[in-house]
């Protein structure tokens, strides 16, 4: 976890594992997490790093967009989550997708 300012921290991305940047906004009343990461493990790693800094866990999670590498960690989240209406529409659609190689290949062809 790296400190950007007194109120903004971030966990670095890792292109080898498609781990995105995940952010913590440190507020005076509560902390906000930006994006959930690409897996439950990624989500828990973020929380561990927050604790290592002596900061409180986030009380709210904001999702910037629906891509899997920013949302698959949501299944491990136990705080309220917010997203735009458009992002939520895509998340509701994507939750029914199959993740076989064939299904992913078909989605790549059709967009």
Give the ranges of each region predicted by the language model:
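General N-terminal targeting signals
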Residues: 21, 25-28, 42, 49-51, ...
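A short acidic, often aromatic-flanked loop/helix-cap motif at beta-alpha or helix-coil junctions
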Residues: 17, 89-90
């Amino acid at each position: 976890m790296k400190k950007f300012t007194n109120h903004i921290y971030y966990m670095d991305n890792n292109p080898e594992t498609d781990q995105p940047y995940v952010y913590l906004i440190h507020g005076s009343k509560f902390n906000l997490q930006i994006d959930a990461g690409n897996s439950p493990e990624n989500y828990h790693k973020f929380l561990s790093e927050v604790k290592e800094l002596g900061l409180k866990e986030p009380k709210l999670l904001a999702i910037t967009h629906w891509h899997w590498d920013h949302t698959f960690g949501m299944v491990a989240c136990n705080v309220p989550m917010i997203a735009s209406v458009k992002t939520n529409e895509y998340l509701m659609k994507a939750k029914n997708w199959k993740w076989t190689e064939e299904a992913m290949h078909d989605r790549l062809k059709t967009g």
